[in-house]
Amino acid sequence: MGVKTISKLKKELDKWFSLYIRLKLSTPEGIVSCCTCGKLGHYKVGMQNGHFQSRRHHSTRWNEQNCAVQCIACNCFSQGEQYKMSIYIDNKYGKGTAESLEMEARKIVKMSRIDYEEKITYYKSIVNKLKLEKNIE
């Protein structure tokens, strides 16, 4: 097997990070709630890792405070419900957090292959640990 491209590493990191966000917020049965509309669903079915600041900003793409569970309707068809998500973020992490994330998103970040590999290893291990703790697949 050859060396993975940065593009493939980014995609793999997205996968593990998304699973982490959804699993950490799930019940032991795997149920999560959309942070913007409250809809309930299984973390694997119709629920996604929504980003307050767009994924195009690498400085906040894998920032846990920038992400929360969203249903497909809110995340895709309602452009992420950014205003509602900002309220959720400020309620969860403290007033001004959403504004700080907006500033952070403007920073230019260049990740190396090692950065991606380390983050993949980190989130993959946490996902596996959460699955064991919650006894879900």
Question: Where are these predicted regions, by residue range?
Answer:
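Short, charged surface segments at domain edges that flank catalytic/cofactor-binding sites
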Residues: 1-33, 109-114
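Histidine-centered nuclease catalytic patch
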Residues: 33-66
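Short Cys/His-centered divalent metal-binding micro-motifs
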Residues: 39-42, 67-94
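Short microdomains enriched in Cys/His and/or Lys/Arg
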Residues: 55-67, 91-105
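Short flanking/linker segments adjacent to small metal-binding domains or redox-active Cys/His motifs
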Residues: 100-137
